[in-house]
């Protein structure tokens, strides 16, 4: 819980800094943070090192500085990450990046979602479904598609914290419950 609060505060601070400069800087910061978070995801030993109190802030700062040099991030993100190192907050980079992405999407009027189907959809069908959902939402939609044969048929749509389960599996579950209750 505390980590989430810390991550949100730092993400909002970086976002406010980028917002003063314009949308291009907001996106640059987001891309740089995403690259850094992706690198940390592939190297979990770095995250463990950032969380380990045995390493001094200077040692952590040196490691993150070398990593940032390799990633060629913008100076603002570099200074931001070095500040995180000084304040012993490097362990929150991935959470900061995730929340920053949410803020950036809100600024651009984009909502993210995922559509789960029982079979793979053709590209034309994907585009049509996405266009219909965008029309209903009135906003741009970044929609990921995945396949889960366990839903048997229909779709499960996840957008933000909402889930619309129109799968055959869910319908059969409702029918089963109704039969058990004698309705």
UniProtKB/Swiss-Prot annotation:
Where primarily located? membrane
**Bilayer topology annotation:** Peripheral membrane protein
Q: Describe the subunit structure.
A: F-type ATPases have 2 components, F(1) - the catalytic core - and F(0) - the membrane proton channel. F(1) has five subunits: alpha(3), beta(3), gamma(1), delta(1), epsilon(1). F(0) has three main subunits: a(1), b(2) and c(10-14). The alpha and beta chains form an alternating ring which encloses part of the gamma chain. F(1) is attached to F(0) by a central stalk formed by the gamma and epsilon chains, while a peripheral stalk is formed by the delta and b chains.
Q: Where, subcellularly, is it found? A: Cell inner membrane
Q: Which domain of life is it from?
A: Bacteria
Q: InterPro entries this protein is in?
A: ATP_synth_OSCP/delta_N_sf, ATPase_OSCP/d_CS, ATPase_OSCP/dsu
What's one GO MF term for it? proton-transporting ATP synthase activity, rotational mechanism
Annotated protein name in UniProt: ATP synthase subunit delta
Pfam families under this entry? OSCP (PF00213)
Family statement = Belongs to the ATPase delta chain family.
The record's function comment reads: F(1)F(0) ATP synthase produces ATP from ADP in the presence of a proton or sodium gradient. F-type ATPases consist of two structural domains, F(1) containing the extramembraneous catalytic core and F(0) containing the membrane proton channel, linked together by a central stalk and a peripheral stalk. During catalysis, ATP synthesis in the catalytic domain of F(1) is coupled via a rotary mechanism of the central stalk subunits to proton translocation. This protein is part of the stalk that links CF(0) to CF(1). It either transmits conformational changes from CF(0) to CF(1) or is implicated in proton conduction.
Q: Does the keyword RNA-binding apply?
A: no
> Which UniProt keywords are present, listed alphabetically?
ATP synthesis, Cell inner membrane, Cell membrane, CF(1), Hydrogen ion transport, Ion transport, Membrane, Transport
Looking up Gene3D superfamilies in the UniProt record yields: N-terminal domain of the delta subunit of the F1F0-ATP synthase
- Nucleus listed as a keyword: no
Q: What GO cellular component entries does it have?
A: plasma membrane; proton-transporting ATP synthase complex
